[in-house]
Amino acid sequence: MNKNQNDWKVELRKATRSSLISITNETDFQLQRISCKLQQGMLRLIPPEIIPPKSSIEFGTESNAFMTGTKGSVIYIVLPPSSSPINVGSIQSLTHLQSLKLWDPLVYIIIEWSTPYWSQHSCSIQVQPQQNSSLLNVKSNLSQREINKQIHSEVLMFIHNNDSNGEIQFKIYKNSLSNSGNGSSGGNNNNNNNSLNNSNNSIGSSGGNGGGGSNGSSPSMSPQFTSISKTNSPQIINTSSNNLNSSSGNNNKPIFSIVDNDYTSSQSTSSIPVVAGINSNSNSNTSGSGSTSISSPNSSFSSSLPSFFSNNFPLPWSNDGFGVDGGWKANVKRGSRGQFITIRNNTSKHLIRRNQTCLNSGRWCEPPPEGIPPNSMIEFGSVSSGFTTGTDGVIHYHSQGSKSDFRFQFNNPLMGKSSFTYHCPNGFNVEEKYTDGNISSVSFTINEGDSQTIPKQIPDSPLPIPPIKTDPKQVFINDDSIRIFSFNVGSINVKESGKELMNINNNNNNNNSNNNNNNNDQNKDKDNQMLNNSNLINKRIEQISKNLINFSEKYDIILLQEVFLDSSKDILIKNLKIYYPYIIDRCGENSGLFFASRFPPLWNEFRQFNNGIGSDVKYGKGVQGVKLDISTIKENTYLYVFNANLQANPDNSIAWQMVNGDDKQRKAATVRTLQLQSIRDFISTELAMQSSTIANSALLLVGDFNLNAEVEQVISDHESNSITLSQIIPELAKKINSKEITLTFSYQLLEYLNDLNIPMRYLGILRSQLQNNRMKSLVLTEMITYIIKKDIIEHLTQRHNQYQSNINEDEQIYREVVLETFNLIFHYTRKDCIQFWRHHLRKRLRSEFSSSLSEIEQQDWVDLRTHVINLQLFTSLKYSLEITFNPKAVFQIMKGSRINTKEIIPIPLILPEQIEEIILPPLTSYWGSDSNTDINYFTNIDHLKEQQKKQAQLQQLQQQQAQQQQQAQQQTQQQQNSNINIINTIESSQIQQNNNIQIYLKQTDEYNNMLKILGNPVDLFRESNPFSPGYTIHQSLNQRVEKPSLKERVDYILNFKLSPNFGDHEGRNQLLKLECTETNIVPMGATPQTRLSNHFALECILHIKKK
């Protein structure tokens, strides 16, 4: 089965010590694992039992106890080209294997690795026995990576032919493998072959005088290798066919064969020779003069785990007397807590183990084999590996044609009783028998046919499952369809809760005059009302969950929204876990999303939206993405399911009453538009990263969108975005990786982004495709700079709106905010600085950028300060915020931004007087936009209309002047000023606010021609982001500094309403670039030399700059 290759590696790197071993088989021979042993740690991924020719495999081990490492070894035997994998369960030792003389020479490879906690790590690979060591060449490469005192070693091992000696010439002894004696197969043999072939498993049986057939035991071949060649070994396939066809002849030795759909591309089989006299558990059936024996269900299948390496060591499954003390069962019994697991497969299905086995605590003494053939039994075990610990884990097996897995879970804790649970697909039932104790054992028996009773629940489970009346005929439909259920479970109760809350508030208002005792009674009544509301929700959840499992046609995937209460999640888990083994109930922080499926998830990620408004402020709504393996429906196929819950519409709740403005519905729609854009980017990012498997995948987006389709316009995905993700960004990353493009400073990176029209929100995707750590640090620095600048603007906006400050006051506020920010992020010894880098910044990076952090960087224990160059970050912030410090401040910043420094750094790090110059950001980037009264735009038509109104008002003023002499003089002065400047015709008697700017646009011919083609200009970013900073039409004008030496500023200052997909991260349209060629600043009050005053007007002529 194909699976996400990075899932188990992510878990592997979380350990304090880990080893990733890669083995490349460059020979023309198969390598079969006959032993695997761990002295320390646990196996995150078990070594595959077969390494095909010209292929490579990977597995990993990790520490699983405090202050321990990982150490282990594995033995692979070289198989001749014409031989199939042997039955390792029948081999007592390597000496025993040599004595059987199956072939000559016998060559095996010993691989050892060690990543201890204290000493140096090491690895070795040897070809044994010594006299045959020159037949193959082996080499190894060991590398180590340390991250926050965690050591991760990677071992690369290569096995290839010795060119000087030529290819190994094997001599196979036929008397040990096939025909000897006289006899011919009887009719029963053919019947056995036909019946077993119909059950997807082939057994070649032979009969003769005194000949016996035995069902040998061997795990299936590994499904997890990465093949170098796209074709399988022809020797294996041809040999399998020959062995299967030889159903008659003189055979004393039986042949057992299994089907492995993961290894071969067709339903071919691989025959496994079984040594006579080893397997004693068999039932004999005679027919004529010959006999045929099929293995009983008690035949044991096992992989290997020896206790030490020598030519005569007993392998762990040996039943001889000298092998008892060194066997794996003895190792289980030595532990403080141990677990024996037995699984009997009484069905006609071949069960294949999932690549990854989960052992939460303890270590494998005997790992579970990779296959369970029909009518056979396997045994394996685990033991505790640390002080005051137990052992628990879960194993998954799947069968072709079943929609879900067989799941077996065990837990033998240090304190308390052992517990076991299981899950089986439709059409099967499992019987369980267990023995409790320090060394507990459990036996699972898999039978065909639906069970008449509900599976037994785990003893002492915190969520016992009550008996539910279900019809045994209610089964999942076994076809090629997938049934999905999506529902908002809180849609009704939210309204009920709002009404109850309003009643509570009304009661509070009516009883304000009561004494304190009455208030206490009132608070109790409020608590009771909230408790009753929770009970109503839980009752509804209980009913919904029971209906889901009692449907005549059960759903394969269940997606719910607004499951906020923990008690509701517990009810859903309690009722659904019987039929849905894969449940994800913890998704983000208070997101309300719930996922249950019969298909195993391969990838799961949650993307939280930016802060909502109204009642959504207290929730962490977002979108959840899950990649499901639906190979049981169609081979090698996947399903991407995205579950989202968008901004709710306004209601009469208190939270919505606190939202300013009258057009609350439009504000909610605007937030939903941004959330849909976030969903689009989230999906596009994942599909771009999984481009290799996207051809075999399907995608589904469900959830509660709260959209009014008749009014709202949903953003459609533009072709330019897909081109940016699939072509432009990968090409840029390729050029940077090959050093065709060299980037040293941040401004160079921004220039490439602007030239290629790559939005800032795609910086995370670009970083995920870079290989050089220096370039990754540079991109991460720009993302952090963008977030810090955005946070500063938000703080400035809040203070400006709170105090209704003017420009002079804003400059002082801005200075204080910038100073506070620099003292926070560069003072590494402060606790709030550590909190910022480890929690706040990581959360903001996830919300603003897709795939911004790697798997390791997403962990809470990773300090992002080690991934950023402090001088580069300071320089980027300095240019972005337009601030200049004196040399002493720069020295203090570099001194304070040292990790683990023992020097005492003063607080604050820098002082206000150390700022030499600071430029206030554009006014429209932080001014309030609810009423949009801070900025007034005037065109020719607007000016004429305003002039007509002014003339009427001037006539009224002239009449008043005739009555009062003082008013007449003021009116005459205003008329003289109106002839000087066109702007002064605006009503001067109108009381203007401190933050009111009036801009008059005198249109040019180029501008009018462009209007005929593109329509009227609008502030697109301000329209779609009413609560976010953005550029407006006067961006390049409101910051002009009138100095002779200053170069005239050119900027994107006008937006045409083309498409929401156009425009960069600050809302500027990159298709049209305008420059201001003529300006006339008309002071209406005191005007500072370096800044525009509180009251002013601009008369500007805009010309379109042709590219």
Swiss-Prot record:
Entry GO MF terms: phospholipase activity; sphingomyelin phosphodiesterase activity
Gene3D superfamilies xref list: 2.60.270.50, Endonuclease/exonuclease/phosphatase
Segments of this protein annotated with the region Disordered: 180-251, 501-530
One Gene Ontology cellular component: cytoplasm
Keywords assigned by UniProt, alphabetized: Coiled coil
Bias type Low complexity, positions: 180-204, 238-251, 501-521
Name of this protein: Uncharacterized protein DDB_G0272682
Originating species: Dictyostelium discoideum (Social amoeba)
